[in-house]
């Protein structure tokens, strides 16, 4: 509940003076006049000292501690005395954090390690205003450093006149101690709601990524003054912080960030270096022995285990300062953010919290019986609210009708402002609603207002990092029948944290189309349905038993996934999964999948892989550990007919040497590769593709290609490749990784590896296809492609025309490119269209005509409905559409227009 608790007896000041610390203690002396006196935890350090801090370099009239007199007695009646236990958690066994005691009720959001967690929402609210430290949410990027009070130092350097290396005793006893109540909030609080709309790059925070404590430490301002911080005129413009943990970001770094000097020196902001939380030394997860506290800001600015404070001219150049805690525009995805350097634009950095509120009562799945007793009384809805920058929450409203009308809530604000009028803590709200009114409601929503009249938006605003989500918090109200003869109202929160199931957004996601679920917002197919795998563990031998289409398991980064249900839906066809079923394919999965695809994988996680010893690694499992007897045979790939087949095992990489390279244009190359044996054929069925594999800059890179050579060519195969060079396209300044690598290969001395066959489509001849394992016949083919997407079409065209006159399939090709110079295989296509006018018709579409004097007679612009109606047949039972091109072309130019032409997009449309 969020109601104030019964007052408890005060913990009166001891009669004797504080004693010096005993050897081996943490160095914190006790004090009696703590502002949280009576709150149920021990009092703290000796009273704040008055007077100057040291030789001061600027006026400091506001240094005294009088501002806290207003709230010293305020919190005792709001603290629950129940102890939240901490113990060694079995989930930490085998990790670098196995030495840390933690509260077992914390909900883990990122697996076993590192710890990222939030408390159960009901348990958090049960404790009211002050959150017990063991229950406080945790955001860790890596293993927790082992801090030692006696040896820990904080270096203060940079643009200061007196650089110093301060010990913990000096911080605790050499500066006036400030005690600040502050609510900490992760910028990702409520992120799972965003992940239900479109997967962000972040994990699933629920609505309990928020906690409140009373923090004690030295004021940052005092420390900087002691060290002689230079003025703005001396170019001292920023204060940078660096922690102690070793993290992988940026190739290896500490966690670091910065704030402006103006903020750091502002006494009204109460910025401190805390070494105590709720009257006790910091817990390891919260930064022991010392951290940074910036009230009113996101938690990501408050560096834990702080080691260095550097006064600089420029803001921090730390990897995590730029690649974390940003709100980028909704159209920016991970690829665009990296390609166009959105991370470094200062306008998108997050500092202060925004206004937010959450309904905590009723809880998720709580049932309110509807009977003669309950309908005669009101039901109390409760929750919390907060804002940033020291702004007070002044209003909270609840609506039962989607915002048509609002009810004003009663506010419970235990906090008193500091002497500058700033509020750093959450508040609680409640409103009584007649049960009969709830019975007629579909949902309940809440919004809060702060003193600047900022409020929350109605609709969710998606962003790549999933941060600062503060749309109206809505719970659904549904009628249920919990017992015979009785009805009730069941309340449904939008999500449940981490991988927990439940929530109306997750349910809605299964029921609605992407457009209905997120109007006006591009929805990604990578959005994961939350898995419920828990911590079930499997050995590699168990995984190897699941290598068939009946049961296809894979291992990626130590997680085990059952992809059987996804075989029919995989964009690359079932073969793309079956080729690695029953094995660890971490390296290959990372080599070919985007971040969105990696997020989708979470849907199918069933547990964790048990590793035994240090000899296990993914390479061994991928290439040597699995038996093909568990792999469903891929059609034609394992059949030996006439010449031996190079692609005899879809799991094995086949080394192929480059024997010829032709430069067809400034960016188009025809590569010819020799098979391992001169009497082999590649063994690739028409419609399938191969993976080209290469190690580039120490990492495996894999890309799909369709050979343009005849399927029965002996001893070699050819790849037609458009090379995407560096610095040619502003959105992709680095160019194509694989195509530039292929361009660098030397004839005669360079090799690549290939794997296959892969793909969900196979043309078996004379109008017959096998699509996702099912037979399909077509008399007419509508082929629409762009750029290098011509290669799978070319393969089918080649097969049809080689089987003349028996194969009577009609092919209608619409081929789009940027200019006439970019059309691949044009000579062959034009020749075939002339030689076989009843079988093949070709129409070109280009963005721009480079040589109008040549008399371009085809279309200019985009692929439109009019072009398709004029040059491909209308949909029907005997017509099949084949498409291959950039995703926007498929989504906006091809699919909607074919649908208008009566194509059955579920059964008569294939995208390679």
UniProtKB/Swiss-Prot annotation:
Write down the EC number: 1.7.1.1
The molecular function terms of the Gene Ontology recorded here are: FAD binding; heme binding; molybdenum ion binding; molybdopterin cofactor binding; nitrate reductase (NADH) activity; nitrate reductase (NADPH) activity; sulfite oxidase activity
Write down what this protein is called: Nitrate reductase [NADH]
Query: What does the entry list as the binding residues for Mo-molybdopterin?
Result: 186
The organism's place on the tree of life at top rank: Eukaryota
Q: Where does FAD bind?
A: 703-706, 720-725, 732, 737-739, 788, 791
Record's keyword terms, sorted: Disulfide bond, FAD, Flavoprotein, Heme, Iron, Metal-binding, Molybdenum, NAD, Nitrate assimilation, Oxidoreductase
Ranges for the region named Disordered are 1-99
Keyword Manganese found: no
Which principal EC class is assigned to this enzyme?
A: oxidoreductase
Q: Does the keyword Cell division apply?
A: no
- Which ranges of the sequence are coiled-coil? none
